Amino acid sequence: MKKVFLLLCLLATTTIATATDLWEGTHAVDWSNTLTIEAAKFADAQVGQKIVVEFKDATGEVIELHSNGGMLPGTRYAHFLYADQHEMEVFITPGMLACLKEHGMEICGKGFTATKVWYGDGKDNVDGNTVWTGYFWMDEWSTLEVAKTSFDGINWSDYKAIRFYSEANRTDYVINVLTKWGDGGKLGDQTTMTMTNEYAELSLEGIDMAARLDTDRLMVQCNKEGGNPFNFTAIVLVKKEVDTGVRDLTARHTSTASKNFNLAGQRVVNPGKGFYIVDGRKCFFK
């Protein structure tokens, strides 16, 4: 009886990883020899799961994931594969999933041989406002380039900000948000954005995003400055709210899921009386 009870406990607390194979073989990818995976293969795919492309013989050239004649939403614009790498992964956003289920996926690029493609367990915190998520290492002037298609179909009048999430757990790093290099390309930096230990937030007030995204990508450049390198993890749109101004809250009415920061950008677990940033909004706790 004890053995049966122990087995039931193990089953109840163990997470079983799942994977769905999409394709397996040997395919030398070139711009004139792409690998196509039909839409039907993604029938059971879900937001937050990861798609993994396994490969060999990489030579430092680019890989691009396409759908319906353009870059797959939620993917990097410039993603290079090197000899010491054997797989790349992308995490499914809502925009990506819609494209996959309607049009499938095409693996493009050059200088590598695809051997397997599958999808499976990934992240569990990807919501409907996420346009890119993954893990991108920010060190010295590292630049994440996200395909413009990640923003397809967005009505910018519904949104007030873009949040750039990371694992930096500090605010003393450099961040530049750009649509192109050179004059007129910068949307904001650490001096104009709201910086917290969890994310940097770019206000869209006064920015015509539809017009500014007249290029093929959105770029996020970071320099670690005096701290350690860190992972960049998500780009999330923040919707406008019906009400405005400072909220008057008490601690007992604050959701335990909310993350509270003081005005210096430091995380506060048990906030006392005063002003705080709660889920991106300035609030007063009694």
Regions found by a protein language model. Give the residues of each.
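Positively charged n-region of N-terminal signal peptides that target proteins for export
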Residues: 1-4, 286
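Sec-dependent N-terminal signal peptides
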Residues: 4-13
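Sec/Tat signal peptide C-region and signal peptidase I cleavage site
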Residues: 15-19
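Residue-level detector of functionally pivotal "anchor" positions at catalytic/ligand-binding pockets or at interdomain
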Residues: 240-264
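Extracellular disulfide-bonded cysteine-rich modules/repeats
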Residues: 273-277
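C-terminal tail/sorting-segment detector
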Residues: 278-286
